[in-house]
């Protein structure tokens, strides 16, 4: 509806410029919003106020000129008015709103989708966990947010590439190998010989057992057979990384999260990309040596202090391979890149961007874009749950999926803005009551399916969309539902463009609430065949929209509950 009104305004502006009613020739960005109060109409725009200066006219005068034209062409409106300092308020006819139902029925599974992205390439990197243990709840929230952002962007026409970056090099991987080796040798965590900063979860014991049993592990591009020699630390490292990559893959598959590309930090070193980037930075003149270390002048690009690239011992700091990795993204043609990461990565953003700018590779300032999510606190019985037996020191994603199910886990992870801390209430997520938001939404869909099953049993066949007497939908409740249905494409677009999946969960709860309230107050199947047909058609559109919105969140729309 907003797009239709925007097109009408643009058309009438052009007409006014053509005949001299308005003279500036300026086409401002036309913003159409829903007024705070219903008595001010369905939509409002401040376009006249934006034009006033260029036209050298009072905003209300410009608004009156536009309204006089729009009254002739905006036949979807019952009334237009100039309000306040120069707003134009639009009152859309009920019959125009009802036509939304026809559009929903025609679009079916595609309702809400658009081609805003025009098929342009965009890469989203998310999860990117170190292969040192099971995925924890922070990874889980990142997986849900990242995957939903991908689904949203695809829904509005972007060509999305999902990428996972494995930090499979560095000290953490060395600690993993030492921990598995200790288990292979029968050394326990309370033994003085246990490695410093070693991993103590039960999963280390599982990896060691599989390694000694000379098992074969397949994980993405790796096919690794354990050597079984507890003294071969390099073989242990390769096997442990492959084993834990496979476990992470299995957890993500159970979460219905999939990737198109897997990139390895170790490959950046093996292919010489890290050394090549360091040399390019040296050649660019943005580095200097001090205290035996190589520094990058990141302050030139907005950092609060310069950063060490290569330590005195010859090792690279962690942001250097990150710069090499992101350069590879740029060279692969991704001019738009989104990184979904935990908020603990905030400090690396400036360093990575500074390194990319220093390369003089034509990469724009502010590339890549970041979505950072805050921590998750898991509660059960009013108390925080902090550990998992298998992981040893944290709650795993698998723990949540096994306890509350995939749908509830995904919904809860995205139901708050990414930069807000999230309390995951296990007891609430398990409830099969309307207090549980995901149950509340899914039950609305199942309830509508049950209504249609009942109608079919009673011999009622819904006529073709064009034959449904939509004019029978006249109550405030019915029109409110229709207007909410009509807003779904805008919700989808806003959620995608702002990387805010929680907007869809809010929308789902609003629509489900309107349906439950309507159904509790009104009979759908009545003695009045026309009213029954109209209300069934309305509920068909509600069910379609609920399913489409749930699908974009990666959540099922059950027909029975």
From Swiss-Prot:
Alphabetized InterPro entries for the sequence: aa-tRNA-synth_I_CS, Arg-tRNA-ligase, Arg-tRNA-synth_N, Arg-tRNA-synth_N_sf, ArgRS_core, DALR_anticod-bd, Rossmann-like_a/b/a_fold, tRNAsynth_Ia_anticodon-bd
Keywords for the protein's UniProt record, in alphabetical order: Aminoacyl-tRNA synthetase, ATP-binding, Cytoplasm, Ligase, Nucleotide-binding, Protein biosynthesis
Motif 'HIGH' region per UniProt: ranges: 129-139
Reaction(s) the record says it catalyses: tRNA(Arg) + L-arginine + ATP = L-arginyl-tRNA(Arg) + AMP + diphosphate
Single GO MF annotation: ATP binding
Annotated localization: Cytoplasm
Keyword Methyltransferase: no
SMART domains: Arg_tRNA_synt_N, DALR_1
GO BP, one annotated term: arginyl-tRNA aminoacylation
EC number: 6.1.1.19
GO CC annotation, single: cytoplasm
UniProt keyword annotation of ATP-binding present: yes
Annotated NCBIfam families: argS
Quaternary structure annotation from Swiss-Prot or TrEMBL: Monomer.
Homology family: Belongs to the class-I aminoacyl-tRNA synthetase family.
HAMAP family, A to Z: Arg_tRNA_synth
Protein name: Arginine--tRNA ligase
Originating organism: Geotalea uraniireducens (strain Rf4) (Geobacter uraniireducens)
Gene name for this UniProt entry: argS
